[in-house]
Amino acid sequence: MAGEDHQWQGSILYNMLMSAKQTHATREAPEARLRGSCWGCSCGSEPPVGREGQPGGPAVALLYRCCFCGEDHPRQGSILYNMLTSAKQTQETPEAPEARLGGACWGCSCGSEPRVGREELPGGRATVLLYRCCFCGEEHPRQGSILYSLLTSAKQTHVALEAPEARPGGAWWDRSYCAQRLGAREELPGGRPVTLPYRCCFCGEDHPRQSGILCNMPMSAKQTHVAPEAQPGAPWWDPSCAAQRVALKSPQVVCEAASAGLLKTLRFVKYLPCFQVLPLDQQLVLVRSCWAPLLMLELAQDRLNFETVETLEPSLLQMILTTRRQETEGDEPPSPQPPVQPHLVLPSEAEHLPSVAEVQAIKGFLAKCWSLDISTKEYAYLKGTVLFNPDLPGLQCVKYIQGLQWGTQQILSEHIRMTHRGYQARFAELNSALFLLRFINANVLAELFFRPIIGTVSMDDMMLEMLCAKL
């Protein structure tokens, strides 16, 4: 039948019979003539006789019996063969890396060997080399290629947005160096610069970079107008300012001189005959109220001169450095005296120290007395005028005290008339000096001259003890 021409050749029945005959005949063919290399799904064996085409008929697909699976496949190299093998490789390739892991794996682009036929196309034209990843089972470009760099850069861009939640370390204005700059924000087309906001690594919002011009400018116009009112601090010469507190430059010498002056003042008062006739409670009223102006007259008479230095509250770093310097002082040789610097005191001590204005009031009174060149008798009459003050609360013998004050002023006036030609001017100058005593606070004198000696003891207790003691 195969070598003869039939009138039914080309009909449907003829084709069915020929196909059935070939099905039964070709099953033994692969075992009899395995002369070519087999590719698993489309062997290289020769086609059966009479299958290339039919005489006078159209060309048909050339199917071959596979020597492994026993099925018919198109001949290798045809379009249908390439389509089938490509589809089959797509489904079967996830298991391929397990069989040929030839290099170190990088997770998304492993170093395994490329599949056969994927290096380049016929003709030498290079293609993108995709590799089957041994972890995710997908194809990725080879590490180091342009496509690989683009993909990994894009992946890092998406991952970086969630990174701020994993690494909080401080406020965004302290961590501007961690912020990631947003792309295409450098400048507009044409070279015109624009504000450079950066993605904050903590709050996830856009902020200007720290140390930039925008960062140093006020955040709003409201802050610009409010700032002067928000800090209504006193001027630098205000005595209430903590930086203008002062302390004695030589406290030991000055405090000893002031203590000696207080002792002489109490001795002068205690041994006055007109003062001794008063009851002890009335003596305490006079002394407790007048010891400060009496002391100032005594210090002026003794010409006590003192210097002060400004004090500053030390910062935490200064306290640490001072403590460390004191600990290592014994191991170091003595160094030359440094220049005078502001005295550092603790905040609890600084609030009790006198201010510059209060010390200037004390020095102003002393300078006034020294400029008048007051004599010893004038100082004694001035002390009596200050001591016998009838306006003090708690006095019971007011008439007696008032008479003592009037008598002291009369004696002072007679002395001035006898010693000075312009006695009225001299008397006015002495009264102006006494007027300055009103601006001197007794607590300031106690803190400045006596607190380092008596500690927490009050001056009222000191007056009682000195009156009862034998001076």
Swiss-Prot record:
One of its GO terms (biological process) is adrenal gland development. A motif (LXXLL motif 2) lies at residues 80-84. The keyword Repeat applies. GO terms for molecular function: DNA hairpin binding; nuclear receptor binding; protein domain specific binding; protein homodimerization activity; RNA binding; transcription corepressor activity. It is found in: Nucleus; Cytoplasm. Residues 210-470 form the NR LBD domain. Its main location: nucleus. A motif (AF-2 motif) lies at residues 462-467. A motif (LXXLL motif 1) lies at residues 13-17. It holds the Pfam family NR_Repeat. GO terms for cellular component: cytoplasm; membrane; nucleus; ribosome. Sequence repeats lie at residues 1-67, 68-134, 135-201, 202-253. A motif (LXXLL motif 3) lies at residues 147-151. Disulfide bonds: none annotated. It comes from the Eukaryota. Keywords: Cytoplasm, Nucleus, Receptor, Repeat, Repressor, Transcription, Transcription regulation. Residues 1-253 are annotated as: 4 X 67 AA tandem repeats. InterPro entries: NHR-like_dom_sf, NR0B1/2, Nucl_hrmn_rcpt_lig-bd, Nuclear_hrmn_rcpt, Nuclear_receptor_repeat. Homodimer. Interacts with NR5A1, NR5A2, NR0B2 and with COPS2. Interacts with ESRRB; represses ESRRB activity at the GATA6 promoter. Homodimerization involved an interaction between amino and carboxy termini involving LXXLL motifs and steroid binding domain (AF-2 motif). Heterodimerizes with NR5A1 and NROB2 through its N-terminal LXXLL motifs. Belongs to the nuclear hormone receptor family. NR0 subfamily. Nuclear receptor that lacks a DNA-binding domain and acts as a corepressor that inhibits the transcriptional activity of other nuclear receptors through heterodimeric interactions. Component of a cascade required for the development of the hypothalamic-pituitary-adrenal-gonadal axis. May also have a role in the development of the embryo and in the maintenance of embryonic stem cell pluripotency. This is Nuclear receptor subfamily 0 group B member 1. It comes from Sus scrofa. The gene is NR0B1.
